[in-house]
A protein has these predicted regions:
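Short flexible coil/turn linkers enriched for glycine and charged/polar residues
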Residues: 4, 158-161
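Long, hydrophobic, amphipathic alpha-helical segments used as structural scaffolds
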Residues: 37-44, 90, 94-101, 171, ...
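Positively charged, helix-rich recognition surfaces that bind polyanionic ligands
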Residues: 146, 160-377
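Gly/serine-rich nucleotide phosphate-binding loop at the start of the catalytic core
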Residues: 1-79
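Generic detection of short hydrophobic beta-strand segments and adjacent strand-loop junctions
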Residues: 10-12, 137-141, 204-207
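Stable alpha-helical structural segments in soluble proteins, enriched in small hydrophobic residues
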Residues: 36, 82-93, 360-370
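Acidic carboxylate diad motif detector
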Residues: 55-159, 290, 294
């Protein structure tokens, strides 16, 4: 048996009083974060040692809450977790994995807070979620989680002023039996910039271009936003409309990728792909930056990885410099002229095979290389 953590996101429909509490908590969390960041910077200037997260928490309880009594009106775990998040940022900086923590801005920073489960203070009901201080908040519940152990909850206000809560559950389940890789339970996928992927079986995932579909409406709303006075009520109203379109696009994309990755994980145990640098490929120099960002291929691979591992399989990544598009899958001949990406079909001068589809051939080669890495081929 193994323990794993899994988060489930629920849409919240708070009443006016609960919204006020959430807003107050967001503000207090931001205030404590900025105050402790200021304390740490002041200690650094005075050549004093760095405060640990426990010392920062004591400082908050003994000093900040005494001076600013309104901090006691919100969930204490929210303030503690804000301090822990600040310490995490410092530790990342010390390990050269991130930059120095920055002060949180009221209008630009993400509005969220995290609270911990203790004494049944968090509960998922049939049509509500109970949260500390807020009580029962109306929610959209789609999964039965009564048998799962709750660890924490993160309340977030989206840019379009909708609310959601991400609840972290601890799941105890049997360790998946590792499946032996074979030719039949393995598939190769080649990245397709104007879709999603092409498989070695010839299946093409023509993912809808959700961003392009909403581009005209988004541009119209952004033009209206540009003409508003920054900081005015109408500016923030229009900003909410723009954010709603972005969230709709993101939800469409995520829904499609979940369905596509689940279908593949149910049919195959091992999926072979190229280890591409999606961030570099989205640069303007390639000429297809928007298409690359729109299809969310990196997110798709992340989904595939954990879904395959849950079933005893795995995602196999082939080296990005492997010339999958240049090698004839029938005879192994490497054709250098295929460095020209405009060539979509070609004839092999070595074995005589004609009308070879570039993408399907690449997917077949990726599968063969993946099987070799798995010790099958």
């Amino acid at each position: 048996m193994i323990k794993t953590n899994r988060a489930i996101v629920y849409r919240l429909y708070p009443n006016k009083k609960q919204v006020e509490l959430f807003q107050k908590t967001f503000g207090c969390v931001r205030f404590v974060y900025n105050q402790m960041l200021s304390v740490q910077e002041e200690r650094y200037k005075n050549n004093e040692s760095h405060l640990s997260k426990f010392d920062m928490n004591l400082y908050c309880n003994h000093n900040l809450k005494t001076e600013y009594t309104w901090l006691k009106e919100v969930d204490k775990f929210a303030l503690t977790n804000a301090i822990y998040h600040l310490e995490d940022s410092y530790q990342r900086m010390f390990k050269h994995l991130g930059k120095h923590p920055k002060y949180k801005n009221k209008h630009k920073s993400k509005k969220s807070y995290t609270t911990n489960f203790t004494n049944n203070n968090i509960e998922v009901g049939e049509n509500y979620i109970k949260l500390p201080k807020a009580g029962k908040v109306k929610a959209k519940i789609s999964l039965d989680t009564k048998c799962l152990q709750i660890k924490s909850a993160t309340v977030t206000q989206n840019r379009d002023e909708t609310y959601q809560v991400s609840i972290l559950f601890e799941i105890i389940e049997e360790e998946p039996v590792q499946i032996t890789p074979t030719e039949d339970n393995t598939i190769g996928l080649d990245y397709k910039s104007n879709g999603l992927y092409v498989s070695n079986t010839g299946t093409v995932a023509n993912m809808p271009h959700y961003y392009r579909q909403s581009a005209n409406n988004l541009a119209k709303q952004q033009r209206k936003l540009r003409n508003k006075v920054i900081g005015s009520k109408n500016y923030y109203k229009q900003q909410k409309k723009v954010a709603k379109i972005h969230r709709h696009i993101a939800n469409q994309r995520k829904d499609y990728l979940h369905k596509e990755s689940t279908a593949i994980a149910k049919q195959y145990a091992y999926v072979c792909v190229e280890s591409l640098n999606m961030k570099a490929m989205s640069n303007r120099g390639f000429g297809n930056g928007k298409a690359t960002l729109d299809n969310g291929y990196g997110m798709f691979l992340d989904m595939l990885a954990y879904k395959l591992q849950e079933r005893g399989g795995d995602l196999v990544k082939v080296d990005k410099w492997f010339p999958s598009s240049q090698i004839c899958n029938c005879c192994g001949f490497q054709n250098p002229i295929l460095k020209d990406l405009t060539i979509r079909h070609w004839n092999c001068p070595n074995c005589g095979v004609t009308n070879i589809d570039r993408d399907i051939n690449a997917a077949k080669n990726i599968k063969q290389e993946g099987l070799r890495l798995l010790g099958v081929a």
